[in-house]
């Protein structure tokens, strides 16, 4: 997408790869649980946690903390969801002075950052469809309930049989991603032309997202999200796993809080004990969190 629009591919790739660094174990359920644990200690947000990682926690150099990423990268990560609305949260987790007045919090992010954000949505929705089918939460044929997928499914319906079912899933998802990207490119070019976007300043002050779907595909995306909500996210087995993930996170927080010296370094504890606990837990994988929980339950 960035290449087609003659934008900075390296910046777009960096933002896309770095965005999920701040995710907790057990996805959004884990994030909600950790945020509840940190309610009285500043809260938790996975987007801002990504910034904490690249600015403070990942240390590779003698002269400074963090990875010394460009201000364009930091701004893109900070504004993953658009202009910054909760300055108080940013101040608690990062510190507004950290950016030294180099970032205007109320403006829109770069086109590269907008591409990264919407690409995340494209990948998220399509791969959740694929995962839902593979997990037997719904069947491929049920995609006919979504207008967007209906025409794609009909195109391959006669070819699908039990021997090529998995290939059919890949093909339909591939077509879906292709259609979304084509629509995104067409609509973005239309926006740039109509609003006469010529500079970074024009982008920042545009007052809207420029990299976005047409109204038709935006409505389709809402349909897809509703389908996934009813068929997958609200499924009893999924909710049960999410609940277990929350229990594990909260239990680990309690365990580490009761004896932080056993898990954290002296340097970590001298700054902010609870933030250090949050950093530690958010950096765990699902497997590590489960194993640690099993050792102490």
Describe the role of every protein-language-model region.
Residues 1-10, 44-48, 53-297:
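Histidine-centered, transition-metal-coordinating active-site segments
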Residues 1-47, 51-53:
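Well-ordered mid-protein domain cores that form the structural environment of catalytic cofactors
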